[in-house]
């Protein structure tokens, strides 16, 4: 399975490079977050072994358990929604929270980060599709939340994040383009640099690269459609740490 992961990663990087060339971009400016939700620590270990340093998890407690099992390594991203009451554990677990979508959550994270003496990287999640089922704030509200975050200690605002609509990859282009335009407008209005556009998943990442993505969130494109059991050793193998 680690060999399959390496082969899939090579194919993904080829697609990223091709999309970057089409847009006149440097492919080295495009990072990959390996999404390991529901997969065991062995999958994270394999990702780190092939050079995927950025690990994405949807649930705070699941990520904390994996970090504890692995004993360190990687840069961990929260890519799922965060409730205010999980702020303390999130600050203890993640390096970058990509899904801040309210001042309430931002303040809870800032308070905890201040308490432990660290600066937590955060991005603002924007609902760029106007789909009421998706998380994220309205594009018109992103500037105000950015201003709030910049006024808080303990947080380092890095950019904006969005999730494209379901359907063909090309359907995501307007959302991705909107996010880039919004990021540029917020930078200009507030006089800050927001280097990250966190957008693009397994079904639409080439389009995201063409539209300026700097952090892709890839699960199936790297790990396939296998369930968590595919990463567990058989009876004759050693434990998961072997």
PLM features per residue range, with description:
Residues 214-215:
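Divalent-metal-activated hydrolytic enzyme cores
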Residues 1-203, 209-211, 220-225, 234, ...:
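Conserved alpha/beta-domain cores
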